[in-house]
Amino acid sequence: MAWRDRRGALRAILTGSACVRPASVYDAISIRIADDLGFPFGMFGGSVASLAILGDPDIALITLTELAEQVRRMSRAAALPVVVDADHGYGNALNVRRTVEELEAAGAAGLTIEDTLLPQAYGEAKPQLVSREEGLGKIKAALDARRDPNLVIIGRTGACSITSLDDAIERALAYQAAGVDALFFTGVKTRAQLEAISAATTLPIALGSPPAELGDFDHLAERRVRIAVQGHAPIAAATEAVFKTLSAIKDGAAPKALTGLASAELMDKVTRADVVAERGEHFLGVKR
Protein backbone atom coordinates (compact mmCIF):
# COMPACT_ATOMS: atom_id res chain seq x y z
CA MET A 1 0.00 0.00 0.00
CA ALA A 2 1.42 3.37 -1.02
CA TRP A 3 2.05 6.05 1.61
CA ARG A 4 -0.89 8.10 0.32
CA ASP A 5 -3.23 5.13 0.65
CA ARG A 6 -2.12 4.45 4.23
CA ARG A 7 -2.67 8.07 5.14
CA GLY A 8 -6.06 7.98 3.45
CA ALA A 9 -7.02 4.93 5.51
CA LEU A 10 -6.10 6.78 8.70
CA ARG A 11 -8.09 9.81 7.62
CA ALA A 12 -11.09 7.58 6.99
CA ILE A 13 -10.93 6.48 10.63
CA LEU A 14 -10.85 10.08 11.82
CA THR A 15 -13.81 11.05 9.66
CA GLY A 16 -15.75 7.89 10.54
CA SER A 17 -18.22 7.33 13.35
CA ALA A 18 -16.48 4.65 15.43
CA CYS A 19 -13.84 4.75 18.14
CA VAL A 20 -11.02 2.32 17.40
CA ARG A 21 -8.12 0.89 19.40
CA PRO A 22 -4.78 0.90 17.57
CA ALA A 23 -2.12 -1.76 17.96
CA SER A 24 0.96 -0.76 19.92
CA VAL A 25 3.80 -1.55 17.51
CA TYR A 26 7.54 -1.07 17.79
CA ASP A 27 9.37 -3.15 15.16
CA ALA A 28 8.95 -5.10 11.92
CA ILE A 29 7.59 -8.25 13.57
CA SER A 30 5.09 -6.49 15.84
CA ILE A 31 3.62 -4.43 13.00
CA ARG A 32 3.25 -7.51 10.81
CA ILE A 33 1.42 -9.31 13.60
CA ALA A 34 -0.87 -6.31 14.06
CA ASP A 35 -1.51 -6.17 10.32
CA ASP A 36 -2.27 -9.90 10.13
CA LEU A 37 -4.69 -9.62 13.06
CA GLY A 38 -6.64 -6.89 11.30
CA PHE A 39 -5.90 -3.84 13.44
CA PRO A 40 -6.91 -0.60 11.68
CA PHE A 41 -3.55 1.06 12.33
CA GLY A 42 -0.49 0.96 14.56
CA MET A 43 0.64 3.41 17.22
CA PHE A 44 4.38 3.84 17.76
CA GLY A 45 4.56 5.43 21.19
CA GLY A 46 7.45 7.49 22.47
CA SER A 47 7.91 5.30 25.54
CA VAL A 48 7.93 2.20 23.36
CA ALA A 49 10.44 3.79 21.00
CA SER A 50 12.78 4.44 23.92
CA LEU A 51 12.46 0.82 25.03
CA ALA A 52 12.80 -0.75 21.59
CA ILE A 53 15.64 1.44 20.34
CA LEU A 54 17.70 2.13 23.46
CA GLY A 55 16.32 -0.05 26.23
CA ASP A 56 15.87 3.14 28.26
CA PRO A 57 12.87 4.64 30.06
CA ASP A 58 10.84 7.39 28.45
CA ILE A 59 13.05 10.41 29.20
CA ALA A 60 13.60 11.78 25.67
CA LEU A 61 17.02 10.25 25.01
CA ILE A 62 16.42 8.93 21.50
CA THR A 63 17.24 11.03 18.46
CA LEU A 64 15.07 11.91 15.50
CA THR A 65 17.31 9.84 13.23
CA GLU A 66 16.84 6.75 15.40
CA LEU A 67 13.08 7.25 15.51
CA ALA A 68 12.75 7.81 11.76
CA GLU A 69 14.85 4.73 10.97
CA GLN A 70 12.60 2.55 13.12
CA VAL A 71 9.52 3.99 11.42
CA ARG A 72 11.11 3.29 8.04
CA ARG A 73 11.71 -0.35 9.01
CA MET A 74 8.11 -0.78 10.10
CA SER A 75 6.73 0.96 7.03
CA ARG A 76 8.74 -1.40 4.84
CA ALA A 77 7.63 -4.50 6.75
CA ALA A 78 3.86 -4.03 6.54
CA ALA A 79 1.20 -1.93 4.86
CA LEU A 80 -0.48 -1.04 8.15
CA PRO A 81 -0.74 2.74 8.70
CA VAL A 82 1.44 3.96 11.57
CA VAL A 83 0.87 6.98 13.79
CA VAL A 84 4.15 8.10 15.34
CA ASP A 85 4.45 9.78 18.70
CA ALA A 86 6.91 12.50 17.74
CA ASP A 87 7.06 13.79 21.32
CA HIS A 88 8.03 17.49 21.42
CA GLY A 89 9.32 17.44 17.84
CA TYR A 90 12.92 17.07 19.05
CA GLY A 91 13.50 20.72 19.78
CA ASN A 92 11.97 24.06 18.89
CA ALA A 93 9.60 24.87 16.03
CA LEU A 94 12.38 24.63 13.45
CA ASN A 95 13.30 21.19 14.75
CA VAL A 96 9.65 20.24 14.45
CA ARG A 97 9.78 21.04 10.75
CA ARG A 98 12.69 18.64 10.30
CA THR A 99 10.88 16.01 12.36
CA VAL A 100 7.82 16.15 10.12
CA GLU A 101 9.94 15.98 6.98
CA GLU A 102 11.84 12.91 8.20
CA LEU A 103 8.82 11.00 9.51
CA GLU A 104 6.80 11.74 6.39
CA ALA A 105 9.67 10.44 4.24
CA ALA A 106 9.91 7.35 6.47
CA GLY A 107 6.31 6.43 5.68
CA ALA A 108 4.39 7.58 8.75
CA ALA A 109 0.65 7.88 8.15
CA GLY A 110 0.34 10.40 10.94
CA LEU A 111 2.20 11.93 13.86
CA THR A 112 1.56 13.73 17.10
CA ILE A 113 3.34 16.84 18.36
CA GLU A 114 2.91 17.57 22.07
CA ASP A 115 3.34 20.54 24.38
CA THR A 116 5.31 18.82 27.14
CA LEU A 117 8.60 20.48 28.02
CA LEU A 118 11.23 17.94 26.99
CA PRO A 119 13.79 16.91 28.00
CA GLN A 120 13.13 17.32 31.71
CA ALA A 121 14.21 20.71 33.02
CA TYR A 122 16.86 20.99 35.72
CA GLY A 123 15.37 20.89 39.21
CA GLU A 124 11.85 20.04 38.00
CA ALA A 125 10.54 16.75 39.37
CA LYS A 126 7.12 17.05 37.74
CA PRO A 127 6.25 17.35 34.03
CA GLN A 128 6.01 20.89 32.69
CA LEU A 129 4.41 22.37 29.59
CA VAL A 130 5.82 24.84 27.11
CA SER A 131 3.89 28.09 26.82
CA ARG A 132 0.75 28.17 24.72
CA GLU A 133 2.56 30.40 22.25
CA GLU A 134 5.48 28.01 21.84
CA GLY A 135 3.18 25.01 21.56
CA LEU A 136 1.17 26.74 18.85
CA GLY A 137 4.34 27.71 17.02
CA LYS A 138 5.38 24.07 16.89
CA ILE A 139 2.01 23.04 15.50
CA LYS A 140 2.14 25.72 12.81
CA ALA A 141 5.66 24.62 11.88
CA ALA A 142 4.53 20.99 11.62
CA LEU A 143 1.66 21.90 9.32
CA ASP A 144 3.89 24.07 7.17
CA ALA A 145 6.46 21.27 6.79
CA ARG A 146 3.93 18.74 5.52
CA ARG A 147 4.44 17.93 1.84
CA ASP A 148 1.78 15.27 1.38
CA PRO A 149 -1.54 16.87 2.37
CA ASN A 150 -2.78 13.41 3.35
CA LEU A 151 -0.23 13.13 6.19
CA VAL A 152 -2.25 13.34 9.41
CA ILE A 153 -0.92 15.84 11.96
CA ILE A 154 -2.36 15.62 15.45
CA GLY A 155 -1.95 18.28 18.10
CA ARG A 156 -1.41 16.75 21.53
CA THR A 157 -1.68 18.30 24.97
CA GLY A 158 -0.98 16.96 28.43
CA ALA A 159 -2.53 19.95 30.16
CA CYS A 160 -5.39 17.97 31.72
CA SER A 161 -3.04 16.31 34.18
CA ILE A 162 -0.39 19.05 34.40
CA THR A 163 -2.22 22.39 34.54
CA SER A 164 -6.00 22.27 34.10
CA LEU A 165 -8.86 21.16 31.90
CA ASP A 166 -9.49 24.77 30.88
CA ASP A 167 -5.88 25.12 29.78
CA ALA A 168 -6.13 21.89 27.80
CA ILE A 169 -9.20 23.18 25.98
CA GLU A 170 -7.61 26.56 25.23
CA ARG A 171 -4.51 24.88 23.81
CA ALA A 172 -6.63 22.48 21.77
CA LEU A 173 -8.71 25.31 20.34
CA ALA A 174 -5.53 27.08 19.23
CA TYR A 175 -4.29 23.91 17.53
CA GLN A 176 -7.69 23.42 15.93
CA ALA A 177 -7.68 26.96 14.56
CA ALA A 178 -4.18 26.39 13.17
CA GLY A 179 -5.43 23.48 11.06
CA VAL A 180 -4.50 20.19 12.74
CA ASP A 181 -6.41 17.08 11.70
CA ALA A 182 -7.21 15.81 15.20
CA LEU A 183 -6.67 16.58 18.88
CA PHE A 184 -4.93 14.19 21.28
CA PHE A 185 -5.53 14.48 25.02
CA THR A 186 -3.68 12.68 27.77
CA GLY A 187 -4.79 12.70 31.39
CA VAL A 188 -8.55 12.76 30.72
CA LYS A 189 -10.01 10.81 33.64
CA THR A 190 -13.76 11.43 33.75
CA ARG A 191 -16.80 11.60 31.53
CA ALA A 192 -17.35 15.17 32.64
CA GLN A 193 -13.91 16.17 31.37
CA LEU A 194 -14.56 14.47 28.05
CA GLU A 195 -17.96 16.15 27.76
CA ALA A 196 -16.33 19.55 28.21
CA ILE A 197 -13.65 18.80 25.62
CA SER A 198 -16.15 17.46 23.11
CA ALA A 199 -18.48 20.42 23.57
CA ALA A 200 -15.71 22.99 23.12
CA THR A 201 -14.01 21.47 20.07
CA THR A 202 -15.08 20.18 16.67
CA LEU A 203 -12.21 17.95 15.49
CA PRO A 204 -11.80 14.19 15.93
CA ILE A 205 -10.42 13.33 19.38
CA ALA A 206 -7.78 10.83 20.47
CA LEU A 207 -7.34 9.76 24.09
CA GLY A 208 -4.25 8.32 25.69
CA SER A 209 -4.90 5.31 27.96
CA PRO A 210 -8.44 6.25 29.08
CA PRO A 211 -9.44 4.83 32.50
CA ALA A 212 -12.29 2.41 33.20
CA GLU A 213 -14.80 5.24 33.45
CA LEU A 214 -14.08 5.95 29.78
CA GLY A 215 -14.04 2.32 28.70
CA ASP A 216 -17.36 2.33 26.82
CA PHE A 217 -16.33 2.76 23.19
CA ASP A 218 -19.87 3.61 22.07
CA HIS A 219 -19.92 6.44 24.59
CA LEU A 220 -16.53 7.62 23.37
CA ALA A 221 -17.62 7.49 19.74
CA GLU A 222 -20.67 9.63 20.50
CA ARG A 223 -18.30 12.24 21.94
CA ARG A 224 -16.25 12.27 18.73
CA VAL A 225 -13.43 10.15 20.12
CA ARG A 226 -12.03 8.23 17.18
CA ILE A 227 -8.85 6.80 18.75
CA ALA A 228 -8.41 5.32 22.23
CA VAL A 229 -4.83 4.22 22.85
CA GLN A 230 -4.88 1.18 25.14
CA GLY A 231 -1.37 1.39 26.54
CA HIS A 232 1.64 -0.52 25.26
CA ALA A 233 1.27 -4.07 26.57
CA PRO A 234 2.90 -5.91 23.60
CA ILE A 235 6.46 -4.81 24.35
CA ALA A 236 5.97 -5.63 28.03
CA ALA A 237 4.65 -9.07 27.06
CA ALA A 238 7.61 -9.63 24.74
CA THR A 239 10.05 -8.60 27.48
CA GLU A 240 8.47 -11.05 29.91
CA ALA A 241 8.62 -13.85 27.33
CA VAL A 242 12.32 -13.25 26.63
CA PHE A 243 13.08 -13.08 30.35
CA LYS A 244 11.31 -16.38 31.07
CA THR A 245 12.90 -18.15 28.10
CA LEU A 246 16.43 -17.01 28.89
CA SER A 247 15.92 -17.83 32.57
CA ALA A 248 14.86 -21.36 31.65
CA ILE A 249 17.86 -21.80 29.35
CA LYS A 250 20.23 -20.51 32.03
CA ASP A 251 18.71 -22.98 34.48
CA GLY A 252 19.51 -25.82 32.09
CA ALA A 253 16.25 -26.35 30.22
CA ALA A 254 16.61 -28.29 26.98
CA PRO A 255 15.40 -26.52 23.81
CA LYS A 256 12.49 -28.93 23.40
CA ALA A 257 11.41 -28.35 27.00
CA LEU A 258 10.87 -24.62 26.49
CA THR A 259 7.28 -23.40 26.43
CA GLY A 260 5.55 -20.32 25.09
CA LEU A 261 7.51 -20.24 21.85
CA ALA A 262 6.09 -19.21 18.50
CA SER A 263 5.41 -22.17 16.23
CA ALA A 264 7.36 -22.66 13.03
CA GLU A 265 4.17 -21.80 11.16
CA LEU A 266 3.80 -18.50 12.97
CA MET A 267 7.46 -17.62 12.44
CA ASP A 268 7.11 -18.38 8.73
CA LYS A 269 4.04 -16.17 8.58
CA VAL A 270 5.49 -13.13 10.33
CA THR A 271 8.75 -13.34 8.38
CA ARG A 272 6.81 -13.73 5.10
CA ALA A 273 8.89 -16.84 4.37
CA ASP A 274 6.66 -17.90 1.47
CA VAL A 275 7.14 -14.54 -0.27
CA VAL A 276 10.91 -14.71 0.20
CA ALA A 277 10.99 -18.28 -1.13
CA GLU A 278 8.95 -17.26 -4.16
CA ARG A 279 11.37 -14.44 -4.90
CA GLY A 280 14.29 -16.81 -4.52
CA GLU A 281 12.77 -19.16 -7.05
CA HIS A 282 11.97 -16.35 -9.46
CA PHE A 283 15.20 -14.35 -9.23
CA LEU A 284 17.80 -16.88 -8.05
CA GLY A 285 16.52 -20.07 -9.63
CA VAL A 286 16.24 -21.71 -6.19
CA LYS A 287 13.55 -24.39 -6.16
CA ARG A 288 11.31 -24.54 -3.13
Curated annotation (Swiss-Prot):
Q: What does this protein do?
A: Catalyzes the decarboxylation of oxaloacetate into pyruvate. Seems to play a role in maintaining cellular concentrations of bicarbonate and pyruvate.
SUPFAM superfamilies named among the record's database cross-references: Phosphoenolpyruvate/pyruvate domain
Hey, which family's this protein in?
Belongs to the isocitrate lyase/PEP mutase superfamily. Oxaloacetate decarboxylase family.
PANTHER family with a match to the protein in the record: OXALOACETATE DECARBOXYLASE, PHOSPHOENOLPYRUVATE CARBOXYLASE
Q: In Gene Ontology terms, what is a biological process of this protein?
A: oxaloacetate metabolic process
E.C. no: 4.1.1.112
**Protein name (record):** Oxaloacetate decarboxylase
Q: Which residues bind substrate?
A: 47, 156, 232
- Specify the superkingdom: Bacteria
Give the cofactor note text: Binds 1 Mg(2+) ion per subunit.
Q: Known catalysed reaction(s)?
A: oxaloacetate + H(+) = pyruvate + CO2
Any single GO molecular-function term of the entry would be: oxaloacetate decarboxylase activity
Q: What binding partners and quaternary form does the record give?
A: Homotetramer; dimer of dimers.
What's one Pfam family here?
Answer: PEP_mutase
